Curated annotation (Swiss-Prot):
The gene is HIPP28. Keywords: Lipoprotein, Metal-binding, Methylation, Prenylation. Belongs to the HIPP family. Heavy-metal-binding protein. One of its GO terms (molecular function) is metal ion binding. InterPro entries: HMA_dom (IPR006121), HMA_dom_sf (IPR036163). Residues 10-73 form the HMA domain. This is Heavy metal-associated isoprenylated plant protein 28. A lipid is attached at residue 156 (S-farnesyl cysteine). Residues 157-159 form a propeptide. A metal cation binds at residues 21, 24. Disulfide bonds: none annotated. It comes from the Eukaryota. The modification Cysteine methyl ester is found at residue 156. The lineage of its organism: Eukaryota, Viridiplantae, Streptophyta, Embryophyta, Tracheophyta.
Amino acid sequence: MNLTLNLIQLQTIEMRVHMDCVGCESRVKNALQKMRGVDAVEIDMVQQKVTVTGYADQKKVLKKVRKTGRRAELWQLPYNPDHMGGSSSNGGYFYNPQGCNGPINHAAPVPTSSYNYYKHGYDSNDYSSYRHHPVHASIFSHQTGSKFSDENPNACSIM
């Protein structure tokens, strides 16, 4: 009997999660910290970025964040420790000899997501030609004007 263990390596998962307030941030953070295999959760509200470090599966982490009601997708430029560190003019955040942010020789991969947002109408320009026409009905009926008419003997009189 051959037993093979599926060992998941320590990984860093970066996601873009749409969060509006501190309550959303705490909901996402609490949900992720309760997961088995998650060691650390860092949230950057300015960039709408959530960084999860641990042994948890990427799909399970995405699913857990989406269960909180927040929209989540993988970060476009995945974590790459080769581009971190070093001393440069930009504080060593992303180090490149040219002084630009992000990896230069690599094209940004298309974010992979287990949920097809395009299929469900998110992030699509298909609806740009749709114009919302306001409803022409109002809160007043067509007989409202006759209630205040001088010709109507049962009309209201405003003094």
